[in-house]
Amino acid sequence: MHQISEHLGDFDCWFSQLFPDTTFLKAIIKYTRLADGTVLANPLKNKSENYLQQHGLQIDYEGNKNRYDLVVFCTDMVVADKFKQTKTIWVQEGMIDKRTILTGIVKELGLPPYFSGDTSLNGSTNICDIYCTASEGYKNHFAANGTDPAKLIVTGIPNYDNQRQYLDNDFPFRNYVMVATTDMRETYRFENRPAFIKKAVKIANGRQMLFKLHPNERVDRAQAEIRKYAPAGTLVYHTGNTNHMIANCSELITQYSTVVYTGIALGKKVHSYFDVEELKKLSPIQNGGASAKNIARICKSYINFGGKKEKFLSQFTFQPEVTPYPEVQYA
């Protein structure tokens, strides 16, 4: 969102973390810990607010300070009623969780999409006016799951559209098998971490290993498990540039992490709990870092459109800026 706003200098941009818009959600946050692994609650809420403050961005939590001409979302699973008459654009921010039996039940019963307990319905509610997707594969995914195909525009997504830049780095290690973990336990999902570590060790087959922990993980627990089940000398990082680590690895093992797309874009051999061939179809387009600018162009055009919201897309022609990018040769 910050990158997109940098191309909207002629507009007065304000930012808000995701916020609860119903009594039910507010009660969940106040009386339970179910939202602790999300930006709805701390510590992630504070972390995102600190980012906004550090970069001098204007904050309007819950969007009450101004009347807005356009609202740009990165989730359509929680959209406040007060914005439903406003022009809205949804921007994909990363990987979408697998659909589960619960996803289907929530969808069929018309329950709020967050009842799925994951992001499997993000991008599939058809609430927003325009949907900016990472790739043609994701466009097809969202269309198949309920969003009007006419609303879907393949723009690429900031942070995942120029992965070759990470090949130029000063990370001191190379040619290791990298394991990027997911915060499943911190978000109340089941995980057998010892079994995952053992599987990664088997894949590495004696090669140097490097674990990069998810930022939300309990570091002490995760490190203790790695020390117990991985070979001596295994490298473990909780902080640092994940993309640089991926750029220098020989093979990447993930669970449900979006960073698998960095590995795919760089032609690495990757492992995931998702089907890898399907991930290659979904992988974000590489346009040399033009996604934020292209999304901002759509924002400008939509804000300046004086007709009815539903008439915009029928007269709009998307002309993306593209930087030539070499075709990826997969390992």
What does each of the following model-derived ranges do?
Residues 3-8, 154-226:
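Conserved catalytic-core segment of nucleotide-activated headgroup transferases in glycan assembly
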Residues 19-20, 32-42, 204-239:
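Catalytic donor nucleotide-activated moiety binding site of glycosyltransferases and closely related
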Residues 1-162, 260:
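Active-site and donor-binding regions of nucleotide-sugar-utilizing enzymes
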Residues 24-26, 98-106, 162-167, 245-247, ...:
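Short, charged, surface-exposed secondary-structure boundary motifs
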Residues 82-90, 97, 238-283:
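A donor-sugar binding/catalytic signature common to diverse glycosyltransferases
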Residues 78-80, 95-97, 183-191, 216-218, ...:
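Short acidic, S/G/P-rich loop/turn micro-motifs used as interaction or catalytic elements
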Residues 282-331:
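C-terminal amphipathic helix plus adjacent low-complexity
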Residues 126-131, 208, 248-251:
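Short active-site oxyanion
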